[in-house]
Amino acid sequence: MVEREVVLPVEVGELWEALTEPEVVAEWFGGEVEWDLTDGGRMHVREPDGGHRDGVVESVTAGEHLRFRWWPSDDVTSVSEVTYVVQPEGAGSSRLTVMERPLVPGAATAVRACAGDHRWSALDDVLFRAWARTYASRSVGFA
């Protein structure tokens, strides 16, 4: 399993929007996502390298957690499960925990490869920059 945890200086609701609004996800993920954020909802991801992933939303509680399964569109045997957990962390801050685990043996290699992916190692910086561009105009006193 790959796990990344970061505390960001944003309210839970703003972090949730940054994780789930397709336009903002495109900024920090680098690809495009289309999804139905309901239990059992379908998703499709176009990755920055041109690859495609399909998936299904397993469970979602707005502002708290999102769990989905996804796989390369051309390899349905490489399924992994991704979970986002958002928690308040003091005044004006939120903790984000992102976990990805393989669900079938073939996915283990892909998940291990993702551990070194720049999107994981820089998630905190990239997500914060995406949040800042999107929400700076809404936040009084944010510079």
Residues of each region from the PLM?
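A conserved amphipathic terminal alpha-helix motif
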Residues: 102-143
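Aromatic-glycine hotspot motif
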Residues: 1-9, 90-97, 143
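Signature tryptophan residues that serve as conserved aromatic anchors
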Residues: 16, 28, 70-71, 115-116, ...
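Residues at helix-coil transition
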Residues: 20-21, 30, 62, 128-133
